[in-house]
């Protein structure tokens, strides 16, 4: 574990105990105290090995029990320390500040791992200022991908708010923590629900086709919404060719022509005809012209475009 100077100072203060730590902190500036305290609030537990390395760097005479770990949170070390150095009021304010910052940091890490489209579905109902603030904290590439899903006017509003952003005030910080916590909870609940759908789909795919049909038919009569979710999830790319023409025409209206052209270039003639008969002659000729060109398209890109097309089909079917 690589520690910077302030982190090493935090470890050392934890080892020398409250009384000696107080005497040391009295010699430091308020900013230095805040920086070290912030390190303590973020570090949580330090292994005895790491602590021993810090000790050996500063003082060869000091050693610790090899079974002893250092916890800044569980033993209330930082709380007692700050109260004695800064007074209870300032200590509480500082600890609340660190707690909020840590919560934001932890949850932003989680948001950075969530698919951009999923995040859009989570935040699209939020105020543009909330969306802008979330994007500020996210990884830049991740934030850019999320922004691309919004319509132009909203994107412009979000960018303007990002450009004018200065900082989160204390009250705003606390509210922001609650908002992100809520988003994470909504995502986790949706994932649990989604996992149930996935399991149901996997089971239906393993049973005989006529039995699957009977189950879905009965489900449509008792719980149409759930049945549609399962049926939509079961759809595969190869099933697109069997869709009714009315769905193909809806798909053509919403799916980018250039992406469809890339897919068509590698698909069989039967698949192409399914789309050609449902689109204008102009678009048909544009796709045919593209397919006739010698253009290399990677398998990864083709698979991505196919997934995009399949997802568009699923949305149409689910909302119909």
Swiss-Prot record:
Protein's membrane topology: Peripheral membrane protein
One cellular component (GO) term of this entry: plasma membrane
InterPro entries, per the entry: Flg_Motor_Flig, Flg_Motor_Flig_C, FliG_a-hlx, FliG_M, FliG_N
SUPFAM superfamilies to which the protein is assigned, alphabetical: FliG (SSF48029)
Entry superkingdom: Bacteria
GO molecular function: cytoskeletal motor activity
Keywords: Bacterial flagellum, Cell inner membrane, Cell membrane, Chemotaxis, Flagellar rotation, Membrane
Site label Part of the EHPQR-motif, positions: 161
Any single GO BP term: chemotaxis
The UniProt record lists the keyword Cell membrane: yes
Location of the protein in the cell: Cell inner membrane; Bacterial flagellum basal body
UniProt motif Part of the EHPQR-motif: location: 126-129
Family: Belongs to the FliG family.
Function comment: FliG is one of three proteins (FliG, FliN, FliM) that forms the rotor-mounted switch complex (C ring), located at the base of the basal body. This complex interacts with the CheY and CheZ chemotaxis proteins, in addition to contacting components of the motor that determine the direction of flagellar rotation.
PANTHER family attached to this UniProt entry: FLAGELLAR MOTOR SWITCH PROTEIN FLIG
Protein name stated in the entry: Flagellar motor switch protein FliG
Gene name of this polypeptide: fliG
């Amino acid at each position: 574990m690589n520690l910077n100077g302030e982190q090493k100072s935090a470890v050392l203060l934890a080892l020398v105990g409250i009384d000696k730590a107080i005497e040391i902190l009295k010699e430091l500036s308020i900013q230095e105290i805040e920086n070290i305290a912030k390190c303590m609030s973020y570090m949580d537990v330090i292994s005895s090995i790491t602590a021993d390395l810090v000790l050996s760097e500063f003082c060869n005479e000091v050693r610790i029990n090899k079974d002893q770990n250092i916890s800044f949170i569980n033993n209330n070390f930082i709380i007692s320390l700050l109260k004695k150095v800064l007074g209870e009021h300032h200590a509480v304010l500082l600890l609340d500040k660190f707690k909020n910052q840590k919560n934001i940091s932890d949850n932003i890490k989680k948001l950075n791992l969530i698919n951009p489209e999923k995040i859009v579905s989570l935040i699209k109902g939020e105020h543009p200022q909330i969306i802008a603030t979330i994007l500020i904290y996210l990884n830049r590439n991740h934030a850019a991908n999320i922004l691309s899903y919004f319509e132009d006017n909203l994107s412009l509003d979000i960018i303007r708010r990002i450009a004018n952003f200065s900082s989160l005030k204390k009250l705003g910080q606390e509210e922001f923590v609650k908002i992100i916590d809520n988003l994470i909870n909504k995502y986790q609940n949706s994932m649990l629900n989604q996992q149930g759908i996935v399991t149901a789909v996997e089971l239906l795919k393993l049973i005989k086709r006529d039995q699957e049909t009977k189950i879905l038919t009965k489900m449509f009569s008792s719980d149409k919404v759930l049945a549609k979710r399962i049926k939509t999830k079961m759809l595969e790319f190869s099933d697109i060719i069997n869709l009714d023409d009315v769905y193909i025409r809806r798909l053509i209206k919403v799916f980018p022509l250039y992406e469809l052209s890339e897919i068509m270039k590698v698909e069989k003639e039967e698949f192409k005809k399914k789309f050609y008969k449902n689109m204008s002659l102009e678009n048909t000729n544009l796709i045919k012209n593209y397919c006739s060109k010698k253009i290399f398209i990677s398998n990864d890109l083709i698979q991505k475009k196919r997934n995009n097309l399949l997802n568009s089909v699923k949305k149409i079917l689910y909302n119909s």
